Amino acid sequence: MTTVHLLHAGYAGDRVGSSIVLVRDADALIVVDPGMVARRSLILEPLAGLGVAPEAVTHVFLSHHHPDHTVNIALFPNAEVVDFWARYKDDLWLDHDGDGYRLSPRSQLWLTPGHTEEDATLVVEADDAVYAMTHLWWREDRTPDVDPLAAADIVIPGHGGPFRVGR
């Protein structure tokens, strides 16, 4: 069973907080963009409500390296941290080509530069829909080659609540 759970709907304005997501797929528990929130309990309580301890999280996926998306990585001490360029675990840094890299059987990274050159999108084929966790702030000179909106039924942007893509 593959499921996607919004733990925290992000926002941007006078304050900033990232959208934080849990993906369950096979043996993988993936947290997406554990960034800035007003209180860490806004991440930990929804996780506990799903029966997930922070120590059980297997992967943390970072869409890019800005603090508003990364500041709470340490909440997940056993997780492998994955971005578009590499995987990080303890003191290991393993370079990889992230385009098409699979974190789990039904989740895949896509290079989608826009907000930053290393922006990546996590596309998940869940049981109920295809989800894209992506930043959605593109600069004109960094338009991605692939459109995560075209592939998804539901988009969870880096800052904001999920929305359905009309096709």
Language model regions located:
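Short active-site oxyanion
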Residues: L29-I30, A56-H59, D153
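Conserved beta-strand hairpin/beta-sheet module of binuclear metal-dependent hydrolase folds
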Residues: M1-G49, A120-L136
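Hydrophobic/aromatic beta-strand patches that form the interior of the parallel beta-sheet core
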Residues: H5-L7, F61, V82, W110, ...
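Short glycine/proline-enriched coil/turn segments at helix->beta-strand junctions
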Residues: A26-D27, I73-E80, P105, D127-D128, ...
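Active-site HxH/HxHxD metal-binding segment of metal-dependent hydrolases
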Residues: Y11-R15, P34-P105
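Active-site flanking residues adjacent to catalytic metal/cofactor-binding acidic residues
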Residues: V32, S63, V82-D83, G114, ...
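Zn-dependent metallo-beta-lactamase
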Residues: M1-D27, G100, R106, P148-I154, ...
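Metallo-beta-lactamase
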Residues: V37-A38, L111, E117-R167
